[in-house]
């Protein structure tokens, strides 16, 4: 029996593949490589010394998805695949709705056809919209502020409805906060196409000299230094959370949401200073206007994941920065460095 990992060549997906292989699972990866590299999977095999099955295919291709299930004994699915840039989703909403929703429909229809009713879904803290306070618990009001977040919210509801209709379904909805860092080997890490959308890969690329300076959006928030506060979680902690969630769906039925965060918030400037300290490089920055929809403070209450999944984040800020710098400095052009 194997675990199907959609989007398994991506940033969080590739790190989760490492943890799955190291935990003894057989894995099948489906990825269209639209925002990832097959080199990541080569390195997953190198890190673990284990093999995996890879299909370069799109979830929108119903025949390709069907053949993955026909050719492999799939026991459960971890579903990462999807478009994920908030700003782009505002500019081209139809593309996001079509890709993220239709792809998941085709996946779930194949799962139903082949009797696979266990799924771990990659959701996001964006489903909380603009939370009034932090820390955020799973029962906070939901409401997305952009089409990307809206697709996550809609898919959460659709997966819950599957369980309501057929209680043999087992669904874990993982709401990530801000993934950061890289595998400690320095062999896999975050490799965004073009200019990064997220703070820390941008900081890393400034430190390594690929980008000139960082734009810090907003320095007038009601926080200790005026910059936004977020919950940054080491990507390996996040990957371990997926293995724990997989154990849960394999051994029980239900549909539950879990926050995967550290429960601690750091400001943009704290992150920049921590990265400068670890890398020994200066990260020049300038202040810019707030981005529409950004909020002052957002961090998780991860108590439910600890209680029900037996998971908690173990790696701190310094380790995140050190691992990120090791990856970025030894792979200046990401996976393209290997070509």
From Swiss-Prot:
Q: Which cofactor does it need?
A: NAD(+)
Superkingdom is Bacteria
Please list the residues that bind NAD(+): 10-12, 31-35, 58-59, 80, 84, 152, 176
| Enzyme Commission code(s) on record | 5.1.3.2, 5.1.3.7
- Single Gene Ontology BP term? teichoic acid biosynthetic process
Q: What is the lineage of its organism?
A: Bacteria, Bacillati, Bacillota, Bacilli, Bacillales
Q: In which pathway does it act?
A: Cell wall biogenesis; teichoic acid biosynthesis
Record: residues binding substrate = 124-126, 176-178, 197-199, 230, 291-294
The catalytic activity, as recorded, is: UDP-alpha-D-glucose = UDP-alpha-D-galactose; UDP-N-acetyl-alpha-D-glucosamine = UDP-N-acetyl-alpha-D-galactosamine
Q: What else is known?
A: It was initially assumed that galE and gneA were separate genes, coding for two different enzymes, but it was later shown that they are one and the same.
Q: CDD domains recorded for this chain?
A: UDP_G4E_1_SDR_e (cd05247)
What is the induction comment?
Answer: Transcription is repressed by glucose but is not influenced by galactose.
- Recorded GO terms, molecular function? UDP-glucose 4-epimerase activity; UDP-N-acetylglucosamine 4-epimerase activity
**General function of this protein:** Catalyzes two distinct but analogous reactions: the reversible epimerization of UDP-glucose to UDP-galactose and the reversible epimerization of UDP-N-acetylglucosamine to UDP-N-acetylgalactosamine. The enzyme is more efficient in catalyzing the interconversion between unacetylated than between corresponding N-acetylated substrates. Essential for growth in media containing either glucose or galactose. May protect the cell from the toxic effects of galactose and glucose or derivatives of both sugars. Involved in the biosynthesis of teichoic acids via the formation of UDP-N-acetylgalactosamine.
Q: Which GO terms describe its cellular component?
A: cytosol
- By what name is this protein known? UDP-glucose 4-epimerase
Q: Which UniProt keywords apply?
A: Carbohydrate metabolism, Cell wall biogenesis/degradation, Isomerase, NAD, Teichoic acid biosynthesis
Q: Where is the active site?
A: 148
């Amino acid at each position: 029996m194997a675990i199907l990992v959609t989007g398994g060549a991506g940033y969080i997906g590739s790190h989760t593949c490492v943890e799955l292989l190291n935990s003894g699972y057989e894995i099948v990866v489906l990825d269209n490589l639209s925002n990832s590299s097959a080199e990541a999977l080569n390195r997953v095999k190198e890190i673990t010394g284990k093999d995996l099955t890879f299909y370069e295919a799109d979830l929108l291709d119903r025949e390709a998805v069907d053949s993955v299930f026909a050719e492999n004994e799939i026991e459960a699915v971890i579903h990462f695949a999807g478009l994920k840039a908030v700003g782009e989703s505002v500019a081209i909403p139809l593309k996001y709705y079509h890709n993220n929703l239709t792809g998941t429909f085709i996946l779930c229809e194949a799962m139903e056809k082949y009797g696979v009713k266990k799924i771990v879904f990659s959701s996001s803290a964006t489903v909380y919209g603009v939370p009034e306070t932090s820390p955020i618990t799973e029962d906070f009001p939901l409401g997305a502020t952009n089409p990307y977040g809206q697709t996550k919210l809609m898919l959460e509801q659709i997966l819950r409805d599957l369980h309501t209709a057929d209680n043999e379904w087992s669904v874990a909805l993982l709401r990530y906060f801000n993934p950061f860092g890289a595998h400690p080997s320095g062999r896999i890490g975050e490799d965004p196409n073009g200019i990064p959308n997220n703070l820390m890969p941008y900081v890393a690329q400034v430190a390594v000299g690929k980008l000139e300076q960082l734009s810090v959006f907003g320095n007038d928030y009601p926080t200790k230094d005026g910059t936004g506060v977020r919950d940054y979680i080491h990507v390996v902690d996040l990957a371990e959370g997926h293995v724990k969630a997989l154990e849960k769906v394999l051994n029980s039925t239900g549909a539950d949401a879990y926050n995967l965060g550290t429960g601690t918030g750091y400001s943009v400037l704290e992150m920049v200073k921590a990265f400068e300290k670890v890398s020994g490089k200066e990260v020049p920055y300038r202040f810019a206007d707030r981005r529409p929809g950004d909020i002052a403070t957002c961090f998780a209450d991860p108590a439910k994941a600890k209680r029900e999944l037996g998971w908690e984040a173990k790696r701190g800020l310094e380790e995140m920065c050190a691992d990120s710098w090791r990856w970025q400095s030894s792979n200046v052009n990401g996976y393209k460095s290997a070509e």
